[in-house]
UniProtKB/Swiss-Prot annotation:
Ranges in coiled-coil conformation: none
Protein name as catalogued: Arginine--tRNA ligase
UniProt keyword annotations, A-Z: Aminoacyl-tRNA synthetase, ATP-binding, Ligase, Nucleotide-binding, Protein biosynthesis
Top-level division of the source organism's lineage: Eukaryota
Catalytic reactions on record: tRNA(Arg) + L-arginine + ATP = L-arginyl-tRNA(Arg) + AMP + diphosphate
Organism: Encephalitozoon cuniculi (strain GB-M1)
Family the entry assigns: Belongs to the class-I aminoacyl-tRNA synthetase family.
Recorded GO CC terms: mitochondrion
GO MF, any single term: ATP binding
Pfam family, one: DALR_1
Enzyme Commission designation: 6.1.1.19
Amino acid sequence: MFNELFRKVVEAISKASKFTPEEIAACMERSYQPKKPNVTLFLDRISPSPQEDAKELLETLAGANIELIENLAIRKSSVCCDINKRAILKDVLGYIQKNREIFGNNNVGKGKRMVVEYSSPNIAKIFHIGHLRTTVLGQFIVNLLRASGYETTSINYFGDWGKQFGFVLLGYSKYGSEEELEKDPLKHLFNVYVKISADAEKNPDVDSEAKEIFRMMEEDKDEWCMNLWRRFRELSIEKYKVLYKRLNVEFDVYSGESMYNEKGKSIVETSKQIKTDEDGSKVFDLGKAGKVLVMKNDGTTLYITRDIAAAIERLEEYSPEKIIYVVSSEQNKHFEDLFGVLEMLGYDKDKFQHVSYGLVAGMSTRAGKVQLLEDIIQESTEVMKNVMMSDNNKGSFTAAEMDQTAEVLAISTLLVMDFTARRVKGYEFDIEKRARNTSGTGLYLQYAHCRLRSIETKNSNVDYNDIETIDFELIHVPKVLNLVYKLLWFEHVVEKCLEDYEPSRIVTYLQDLASSINGAINILRVLGVDKELARARLLVLSSARIVLHNGLRILGATPLNKM
């Protein structure tokens, strides 16, 4: 509906002026901020004499009496106006109510397929706060693409192969505990890895032994190693699945580097573009971009070798518009090399995209001083419990409800904390700070949603479903009209996110929307007012809740009904 509204505005302005629809669209900027005009036409972008044309256009539009626009004015060489919100009020609210949980969706990707690879932790390392970014950003992109009509395949490509497994297997033979492995495979394997890495720093022979173990794995020559590796992998994946469920993250495919070991070798052995370096290793020479090592002189493959094989298989299996990799900016060079090699092999480079992000401050893995994400979720949940207790909500929840609600609030706060800044920027993790200052946080958005749901529940006897019988003049109030206009913008914000996969766009919009809801809620009181006024007001509040709900879902949060 958003696009249709502005298409009509463009056509109406064009019809009344000397400018084509294409010219009007090219010079038009739109806004929902109350202190800015809804529409500004920057005529200096399309006219050699913008000031003269601005005066002429203002006079023309003033005489045209276009129903959809009002408050015409000139600002320097631009013509400004507002959308006549009274004219669209009924249609916007009716459209939101009709579409409800799919309001904000679009058909940009209809008939097209996308593949998104994200999370992709290493089996040998713990799942810490640094992994949160790829996981939740990747799920956001999947949610966004599906809301935009794309058939989307989500892939978790585990780091389940490589030299580090030589270290893990060697470490387990020395420091492993069957009891600890069963109890918490991720934490135990990480502790084993840290201990054997410390040994390697003191004794070079440990490093050589680990390399030899991995070489035997590559050649499938050691049954003990392979059986133990498979067990580590299975136990770890089951543990990850539990964590993913808590984060509202789901994958269509659980994959891993190990699945592409042989195919990677085959590409190296059969590719005509491959070159042998002076030391006997195999490389792709990308010219100015440098050489890309894909096989060492001892015959072992590398991470990028398996990435090449995985990318080719995905192209063949899914025929996607694009394969998106959600990985930190630390891996920029890796993906430049990967896409360069794929292009050299004859594949379209534009089929691949690296969506990067900045890092969470204070994370280190060398000394083992890293918090498990599982522990962080639990600590964050305790913080949220304290917030709920301080709001005197203890009596309205059972113990189980308190735990469940606090965890949803914790996850929501983690998500919004991660998504508030642009993804290319890093941030410092501080859940207690976010709990103390709730403005703009996940807690703030959930509170706004719960408040609206509570009003709906308390006024369940008020029937606003028959839009045709509602008296919309009862809510011709500036704050309400601006709020409803802002609700329509959700469609545009979702579509705009497809340009850069930037979740901060939706977070900023939802924060602003929640603020507008809080600013208008006192003049939208439902309880104890005239029946017709109650119907009109509740329709607005219900529509606002639907938009908040849908926005939270795209971000990956579970909207709460009470807190």
